[in-house]
Protein backbone atom coordinates (compact mmCIF):
# COMPACT_ATOMS: atom_id res chain seq x y z
CA UNK A 1 0.00 0.00 0.00
CA UNK A 2 1.20 3.48 -0.85
CA UNK A 3 0.21 6.13 1.65
CA UNK A 4 -0.58 9.70 0.63
CA UNK A 5 -2.62 11.08 3.50
CA UNK A 6 -5.55 11.21 3.59
CA UNK A 7 -5.68 8.67 0.73
CA UNK A 8 -4.06 5.29 0.31
CA UNK A 9 -3.39 3.57 -2.99
CA UNK A 10 -3.61 -0.20 -3.21
CA UNK A 11 -2.31 -1.75 -6.43
CA UNK A 12 -3.88 -4.91 -7.85
CA UNK A 13 -0.99 -6.49 -9.73
CA UNK A 14 -2.34 -8.23 -12.82
CA UNK A 15 0.29 -7.43 -15.42
CA UNK A 16 -1.13 -5.34 -18.25
CA UNK A 17 -4.51 -5.31 -16.49
CA UNK A 18 -3.20 -3.98 -13.16
CA UNK A 19 -5.21 -1.21 -11.55
CA UNK A 20 -5.32 1.06 -8.53
CA UNK A 21 -7.75 1.20 -5.62
CA UNK A 22 -7.86 4.68 -4.11
CA UNK A 23 -9.05 4.61 -0.49
CA UNK A 24 -9.97 7.35 1.93
CA UNK A 25 -12.20 10.27 2.85
CA UNK A 26 -12.57 12.40 -0.30
CA UNK A 27 -11.14 9.88 -2.77
CA UNK A 28 -13.95 10.71 -5.20
CA UNK A 29 -12.08 13.92 -6.08
CA UNK A 30 -9.58 11.76 -7.98
CA UNK A 31 -12.20 10.36 -10.36
CA UNK A 32 -12.21 13.21 -12.87
CA UNK A 33 -8.43 13.34 -13.44
CA UNK A 34 -8.14 9.54 -13.56
CA UNK A 35 -11.14 9.10 -15.84
CA UNK A 36 -10.00 11.74 -18.30
CA UNK A 37 -6.85 9.69 -18.91
CA UNK A 38 -8.93 6.63 -19.84
CA UNK A 39 -11.60 8.11 -22.07
CA UNK A 40 -11.40 8.54 -25.82
CA UNK A 41 -14.24 11.06 -25.67
CA UNK A 42 -15.46 13.18 -22.74
CA UNK A 43 -18.45 11.11 -21.67
CA UNK A 44 -19.09 8.05 -19.54
CA UNK A 45 -22.05 5.89 -18.58
CA UNK A 46 -23.09 5.57 -14.93
CA UNK A 47 -25.09 2.65 -13.57
CA UNK A 48 -26.50 3.25 -10.11
CA UNK A 49 -29.56 2.60 -8.00
CA UNK A 50 -32.29 5.01 -7.00
CA UNK A 51 -31.09 5.35 -3.41
CA UNK A 52 -27.48 6.12 -4.34
CA UNK A 53 -28.61 8.57 -7.02
CA UNK A 54 -30.72 10.42 -4.49
CA UNK A 55 -27.83 10.78 -2.03
CA UNK A 56 -24.74 11.04 -4.21
CA UNK A 57 -25.50 11.90 -7.86
CA UNK A 58 -24.48 15.52 -7.39
CA UNK A 59 -21.18 14.47 -5.79
CA UNK A 60 -20.26 12.28 -8.74
CA UNK A 61 -21.22 14.97 -11.24
CA UNK A 62 -19.08 17.47 -9.33
CA UNK A 63 -16.13 15.06 -9.28
CA UNK A 64 -15.93 14.97 -13.09
CA UNK A 65 -17.10 18.51 -13.88
CA UNK A 66 -13.63 20.07 -13.98
CA UNK A 67 -12.54 17.35 -16.41
CA UNK A 68 -15.42 18.26 -18.73
CA UNK A 69 -16.88 14.75 -18.69
CA UNK A 70 -20.57 14.29 -19.46
CA UNK A 71 -22.34 11.47 -17.63
CA UNK A 72 -25.26 9.38 -18.93
CA UNK A 73 -27.20 7.85 -16.01
CA UNK A 74 -29.32 4.76 -15.46
CA UNK A 75 -30.86 4.20 -12.02
CA UNK A 76 -32.21 0.78 -11.05
CA UNK A 77 -34.35 -0.23 -8.07
CA UNK A 78 -32.20 -0.98 -5.01
CA UNK A 79 -31.87 -4.49 -3.60
CA UNK A 80 -30.69 -7.99 -4.44
CA UNK A 81 -33.72 -8.75 -6.64
CA UNK A 82 -32.35 -6.25 -9.17
CA UNK A 83 -29.44 -8.63 -9.91
CA UNK A 84 -31.42 -10.53 -12.55
CA UNK A 85 -31.35 -11.42 -16.24
CA UNK A 86 -34.22 -9.06 -17.01
CA UNK A 87 -32.46 -6.09 -15.43
CA UNK A 88 -29.19 -7.03 -17.13
CA UNK A 89 -30.94 -6.98 -20.50
CA UNK A 90 -32.27 -3.52 -19.69
CA UNK A 91 -28.78 -2.25 -18.85
CA UNK A 92 -27.38 -3.58 -22.12
CA UNK A 93 -30.23 -2.03 -24.09
CA UNK A 94 -29.59 1.33 -22.40
CA UNK A 95 -25.90 1.15 -23.35
CA UNK A 96 -26.69 0.23 -26.95
CA UNK A 97 -29.31 2.95 -27.24
CA UNK A 98 -26.75 5.43 -25.93
CA UNK A 99 -24.25 4.48 -28.61
CA UNK A 100 -21.74 2.88 -26.25
CA UNK A 101 -18.73 1.24 -27.83
CA UNK A 102 -15.64 -0.58 -26.61
CA UNK A 103 -13.79 2.68 -26.13
CA UNK A 104 -16.35 3.96 -23.64
CA UNK A 105 -16.40 3.43 -19.89
CA UNK A 106 -19.19 2.25 -17.60
CA UNK A 107 -19.01 3.44 -14.00
CA UNK A 108 -20.70 1.22 -11.41
CA UNK A 109 -21.77 3.68 -8.71
CA UNK A 110 -23.37 1.74 -5.89
CA UNK A 111 -23.12 -1.37 -3.78
CA UNK A 112 -22.39 -4.97 -4.67
CA UNK A 113 -25.52 -5.46 -6.75
CA UNK A 114 -24.70 -2.51 -9.00
CA UNK A 115 -21.03 -3.50 -9.18
CA UNK A 116 -21.81 -7.09 -10.14
CA UNK A 117 -24.42 -6.03 -12.70
CA UNK A 118 -22.25 -3.27 -14.12
CA UNK A 119 -19.21 -5.49 -14.45
CA UNK A 120 -21.13 -8.21 -16.25
CA UNK A 121 -22.77 -5.67 -18.56
CA UNK A 122 -19.38 -4.10 -19.33
CA UNK A 123 -17.88 -7.52 -20.09
CA UNK A 124 -20.70 -8.34 -22.51
CA UNK A 125 -20.97 -4.96 -24.21
CA UNK A 126 -19.36 -5.49 -27.61
CA UNK A 127 -17.12 -8.09 -25.92
CA UNK A 128 -15.81 -5.64 -23.38
CA UNK A 129 -15.94 -1.91 -22.64
CA UNK A 130 -14.07 0.07 -20.01
CA UNK A 131 -15.23 -0.41 -16.43
CA UNK A 132 -14.70 1.63 -13.26
CA UNK A 133 -15.98 0.82 -9.77
CA UNK A 134 -17.07 3.56 -7.37
CA UNK A 135 -18.50 1.49 -4.50
CA UNK A 136 -20.81 3.26 -2.06
CA UNK A 137 -21.25 0.55 0.58
CA UNK A 138 -18.66 -0.74 3.01
CA UNK A 139 -19.20 -4.28 1.77
CA UNK A 140 -18.55 -3.30 -1.83
CA UNK A 141 -15.51 -1.20 -0.94
CA UNK A 142 -13.73 -4.06 0.81
CA UNK A 143 -14.93 -7.01 -1.24
CA UNK A 144 -17.09 -7.06 -4.34
CA UNK A 145 -15.53 -4.06 -6.12
CA UNK A 146 -12.08 -5.67 -6.09
CA UNK A 147 -11.07 -8.70 -8.09
CA UNK A 148 -13.29 -8.76 -11.16
CA UNK A 149 -16.09 -11.12 -10.17
CA UNK A 150 -19.36 -10.23 -11.91
CA UNK A 151 -22.67 -12.08 -11.91
CA UNK A 152 -26.44 -12.17 -11.79
CA UNK A 153 -28.63 -14.46 -9.72
CA UNK A 154 -31.09 -17.08 -10.93
CA UNK A 155 -33.94 -18.87 -9.12
CA UNK A 156 -31.53 -21.81 -8.74
CA UNK A 157 -28.96 -19.84 -6.80
CA UNK A 158 -26.82 -16.79 -6.29
CA UNK A 159 -24.10 -15.66 -8.71
CA UNK A 160 -24.43 -18.73 -10.93
CA UNK A 161 -24.21 -16.75 -14.20
CA UNK A 162 -21.19 -14.48 -14.43
CA UNK A 163 -17.66 -13.79 -15.60
CA UNK A 164 -14.32 -12.49 -14.39
CA UNK A 165 -13.88 -8.94 -15.68
CA UNK A 166 -11.48 -6.54 -13.98
CA UNK A 167 -12.16 -2.84 -13.53
CA UNK A 168 -9.59 -0.29 -14.63
CA UNK A 169 -9.93 1.72 -11.43
CA UNK A 170 -11.65 1.50 -8.04
CA UNK A 171 -12.47 4.61 -6.00
CA UNK A 172 -13.34 3.73 -2.38
CA UNK A 173 -14.35 7.05 -0.83
CA UNK A 174 -15.20 6.39 2.81
CA UNK A 175 -17.10 9.71 2.95
CA UNK A 176 -19.79 8.10 0.78
CA UNK A 177 -20.52 5.65 3.60
CA UNK A 178 -21.96 8.36 5.87
CA UNK A 179 -25.46 7.97 4.40
CA UNK A 180 -25.58 4.21 5.01
CA UNK A 181 -27.88 2.79 7.68
CA UNK A 182 -26.02 1.24 10.60
CA UNK A 183 -27.22 -2.19 9.50
CA UNK A 184 -25.57 -1.81 6.08
CA UNK A 185 -22.30 -0.78 7.72
CA UNK A 186 -22.38 -3.84 9.95
CA UNK A 187 -23.01 -6.06 6.92
CA UNK A 188 -19.91 -4.65 5.24
CA UNK A 189 -17.92 -4.97 8.43
CA UNK A 190 -18.46 -8.74 8.29
CA UNK A 191 -16.33 -8.88 5.14
CA UNK A 192 -13.59 -6.87 6.89
CA UNK A 193 -13.54 -9.38 9.74
CA UNK A 194 -13.26 -12.13 7.13
CA UNK A 195 -9.78 -10.98 6.10
CA UNK A 196 -8.56 -11.33 9.66
CA UNK A 197 -10.07 -14.78 9.94
CA UNK A 198 -8.53 -15.98 6.67
CA UNK A 199 -4.84 -15.25 7.22
CA UNK A 200 -4.29 -12.18 9.41
CA UNK A 201 -4.86 -12.88 13.09
CA UNK A 202 -3.21 -9.56 14.01
CA UNK A 203 -5.82 -7.69 11.96
CA UNK A 204 -8.59 -9.66 13.67
CA UNK A 205 -7.12 -8.64 17.04
CA UNK A 206 -7.02 -4.99 15.88
CA UNK A 207 -10.66 -5.21 14.82
CA UNK A 208 -11.68 -6.73 18.14
CA UNK A 209 -10.36 -3.52 19.76
CA UNK A 210 -11.14 -0.94 17.06
CA UNK A 211 -14.22 -2.33 15.33
CA UNK A 212 -16.55 0.26 16.82
CA UNK A 213 -14.33 3.05 15.46
CA UNK A 214 -14.63 1.53 12.00
CA UNK A 215 -18.40 1.27 12.32
CA UNK A 216 -18.52 4.90 13.51
CA UNK A 217 -16.59 5.82 10.33
CA UNK A 218 -13.80 7.55 12.18
CA UNK A 219 -11.69 8.59 9.16
CA UNK A 220 -8.36 7.06 10.17
CA UNK A 221 -9.87 3.79 11.37
CA UNK A 222 -12.16 3.47 8.36
CA UNK A 223 -9.37 4.19 5.90
CA UNK A 224 -7.03 1.73 7.60
CA UNK A 225 -9.62 -1.05 7.72
CA UNK A 226 -10.75 -0.58 4.12
CA UNK A 227 -7.21 -0.26 2.75
CA UNK A 228 -5.92 -3.28 4.69
CA UNK A 229 -8.89 -5.33 3.50
CA UNK A 230 -8.36 -4.25 -0.12
CA UNK A 231 -4.64 -5.02 0.12
CA UNK A 232 -5.41 -8.49 1.46
CA UNK A 233 -7.82 -9.19 -1.36
CA UNK A 234 -5.52 -7.64 -3.98
CA UNK A 235 -2.69 -9.96 -2.96
CA UNK A 236 -4.92 -13.02 -3.22
CA UNK A 237 -6.39 -11.93 -6.58
CA UNK A 238 -2.92 -11.27 -8.00
CA UNK A 239 -1.92 -14.82 -7.06
CA UNK A 240 -5.13 -16.55 -8.19
CA UNK A 241 -7.34 -14.37 -10.37
CA UNK A 242 -9.85 -17.02 -11.45
CA UNK A 243 -10.32 -18.83 -8.13
CA UNK A 244 -8.60 -22.13 -8.79
CA UNK A 245 -6.52 -22.04 -5.61
CA UNK A 246 -5.92 -19.57 -2.80
CA UNK A 247 -8.70 -17.20 -3.89
CA UNK A 248 -11.19 -19.79 -2.71
CA UNK A 249 -10.29 -18.71 0.83
CA UNK A 250 -12.24 -15.51 0.19
CA UNK A 251 -15.36 -17.68 0.24
CA UNK A 252 -15.08 -18.19 4.00
CA UNK A 253 -18.66 -18.14 5.25
CA UNK A 254 -20.09 -17.90 1.74
CA UNK A 255 -21.12 -21.51 1.11
CA UNK A 256 -23.29 -21.41 4.21
CA UNK A 257 -24.20 -17.79 3.56
CA UNK A 258 -25.36 -18.26 -0.02
CA UNK A 259 -27.57 -21.14 1.10
CA UNK A 260 -29.10 -18.93 3.78
CA UNK A 261 -29.78 -16.17 1.24
CA UNK A 262 -31.36 -18.59 -1.23
CA UNK A 263 -33.47 -20.19 1.52
CA UNK A 264 -34.64 -16.70 2.44
CA UNK A 265 -35.42 -15.95 -1.23
CA UNK A 266 -33.06 -12.94 -1.10
CA UNK A 267 -35.46 -10.97 1.08
CA UNK A 268 -34.17 -7.82 2.72
CA UNK A 269 -34.41 -9.19 6.26
CA UNK A 270 -31.08 -10.96 5.61
CA UNK A 271 -28.42 -8.87 3.89
CA UNK A 272 -25.50 -10.52 2.11
CA UNK A 273 -22.99 -9.40 4.72
CA UNK A 274 -25.25 -10.65 7.49
CA UNK A 275 -25.47 -14.02 5.75
CA UNK A 276 -21.67 -14.10 5.47
CA UNK A 277 -21.27 -13.27 9.17
CA UNK A 278 -23.67 -16.05 10.07
CA UNK A 279 -21.86 -18.36 7.65
CA UNK A 280 -18.46 -17.58 9.17
CA UNK A 281 -19.71 -18.19 12.69
CA UNK A 282 -21.17 -21.52 11.58
CA UNK A 283 -18.05 -22.48 9.61
CA UNK A 284 -15.94 -22.01 12.75
CA UNK A 285 -18.45 -23.90 14.89
CA UNK A 286 -18.71 -26.70 12.30
CA UNK A 287 -14.92 -26.86 12.33
CA UNK A 288 -14.96 -27.10 16.12
CA UNK A 289 -17.63 -29.82 16.02
CA UNK A 290 -15.47 -31.71 13.50
CA UNK A 291 -12.32 -31.47 15.62
CA UNK A 292 -10.60 -29.07 13.20
CA UNK A 293 -10.98 -25.67 14.85
CA UNK A 294 -10.12 -24.92 18.50
CA UNK A 295 -13.39 -24.45 20.35
CA UNK A 296 -12.02 -21.28 21.98
CA UNK A 297 -11.41 -19.72 18.56
CA UNK A 298 -14.90 -20.62 17.38
CA UNK A 299 -16.34 -19.03 20.51
CA UNK A 300 -14.24 -15.89 20.05
CA UNK A 301 -15.35 -15.47 16.42
CA UNK A 302 -18.96 -15.80 17.50
CA UNK A 303 -18.37 -13.26 20.28
CA UNK A 304 -16.64 -10.63 18.11
CA UNK A 305 -19.18 -10.86 15.30
CA UNK A 306 -22.09 -10.85 17.73
CA UNK A 307 -20.70 -7.82 19.58
CA UNK A 308 -20.86 -5.92 16.28
CA UNK A 309 -24.57 -6.62 16.03
CA UNK A 310 -24.24 -9.28 13.35
CA UNK A 311 -26.24 -12.54 13.33
CA UNK A 312 -24.30 -15.52 14.64
CA UNK A 313 -27.02 -18.16 15.03
CA UNK A 314 -30.08 -19.44 13.18
CA UNK A 315 -32.33 -18.50 16.07
CA UNK A 316 -35.26 -16.39 14.96
CA UNK A 317 -35.24 -17.40 11.29
CA UNK A 318 -38.26 -19.09 9.71
CA UNK A 319 -37.85 -22.80 10.63
CA UNK A 320 -39.61 -23.93 7.46
CA UNK A 321 -37.32 -21.94 5.18
CA UNK A 322 -34.21 -22.77 7.20
CA UNK A 323 -34.80 -26.49 7.74
CA UNK A 324 -31.51 -28.40 7.83
CA UNK A 325 -32.33 -30.64 4.86
CA UNK A 326 -33.37 -27.64 2.76
CA UNK A 327 -30.18 -25.76 3.58
CA UNK A 328 -28.04 -28.80 2.75
CA UNK A 329 -29.84 -29.20 -0.58
CA UNK A 330 -29.14 -25.55 -1.39
CA UNK A 331 -25.47 -26.02 -0.51
CA UNK A 332 -25.44 -28.85 -3.06
CA UNK A 333 -26.21 -26.14 -5.65
CA UNK A 334 -22.83 -24.53 -4.92
CA UNK A 335 -20.77 -24.15 -8.10
CA UNK A 336 -18.05 -26.41 -6.67
CA UNK A 337 -20.24 -29.15 -5.15
CA UNK A 338 -19.77 -32.72 -6.39
CA UNK A 339 -21.79 -35.87 -5.63
CA UNK A 340 -22.94 -35.17 -2.10
CA UNK A 341 -19.76 -33.41 -1.08
CA UNK A 342 -18.92 -29.73 -1.09
CA UNK A 343 -15.68 -27.84 -0.53
CA UNK A 344 -15.90 -25.66 2.57
CA UNK A 345 -13.53 -22.98 3.77
CA UNK A 346 -12.73 -24.01 7.32
CA UNK A 347 -10.04 -22.86 9.74
CA UNK A 348 -7.46 -24.49 11.96
CA UNK A 349 -7.69 -21.32 14.01
CA UNK A 350 -8.17 -17.58 13.65
CA UNK A 351 -6.02 -16.46 10.71
CA UNK A 352 -5.52 -20.03 9.51
CA UNK A 353 -8.25 -20.73 6.96
CA UNK A 354 -7.89 -23.50 4.40
CA UNK A 355 -9.92 -25.26 1.72
CA UNK A 356 -11.52 -28.42 3.10
CA UNK A 357 -12.07 -30.08 -0.28
CA UNK A 358 -14.83 -32.58 0.35
CA UNK A 359 -17.06 -31.92 3.33
CA UNK A 360 -19.80 -34.52 3.55
CA UNK A 361 -23.15 -32.78 3.15
CA UNK A 362 -24.78 -35.38 5.39
CA UNK A 363 -22.49 -34.31 8.24
CA UNK A 364 -23.17 -30.66 7.45
CA UNK A 365 -26.91 -31.37 7.59
CA UNK A 366 -26.55 -33.05 10.99
CA UNK A 367 -24.59 -30.04 12.24
CA UNK A 368 -27.24 -27.63 10.95
CA UNK A 369 -29.94 -29.69 12.63
CA UNK A 370 -28.06 -29.38 15.92
CA UNK A 371 -27.79 -25.60 15.43
CA UNK A 372 -31.53 -25.42 14.84
CA UNK A 373 -32.44 -27.60 17.81
Curated annotation (Swiss-Prot):
Record: residues binding NAD(+): 112-116, 136-137, 149, 158
Cofactor binding: number and manner: Binds 1 divalent metal cation per subunit. Can use either Co(2+) or Zn(2+).
First-listed, main subcellular location of the protein, grouped into a coarse class: cytoplasm
GO terms for biological process, alphabetical: amino acid biosynthetic process; aromatic amino acid family biosynthetic process; chorismate biosynthetic process
Molecular function as annotated in GO: 3-dehydroquinate synthase activity; metal ion binding; nucleotide binding
Catalytic activity field: 7-phospho-2-dehydro-3-deoxy-D-arabino-heptonate = 3-dehydroquinate + phosphate
Compartment(s) where it occurs, according to its Swiss-Prot or TrEMBL record: Cytoplasm
Keywords: Amino-acid biosynthesis, Aromatic amino acid biosynthesis, Cobalt, Cytoplasm, Lyase, Metal-binding, NAD, Nucleotide-binding, Zinc
Superkingdom of this protein's organism: Bacteria
Keyword S-adenosyl-L-methionine annotated: no
GO CC field: cytoplasm
InterPro entries: Dehydroquinate_synthase, DHQ_synth_AroB, DHQ_synth_fam, DHQS/DOIS_N, DHQS_C
Pathway: Metabolic intermediate biosynthesis; chorismate biosynthesis; chorismate from D-erythrose 4-phosphate and phosphoenolpyruvate: step 2/7
EC number: 4.2.3.4
Obligatory cofactor(s): Co(2+); Zn(2+); NAD(+)
Main function: Catalyzes the conversion of 3-deoxy-D-arabino-heptulosonate 7-phosphate (DAHP) to dehydroquinate (DHQ).
Record family assignment: Belongs to the sugar phosphate cyclases superfamily. Dehydroquinate synthase family.
Record protein name field: 3-dehydroquinate synthase
Species per Swiss-Prot/TrEMBL record: Hyphomonas neptunium (strain ATCC 15444)
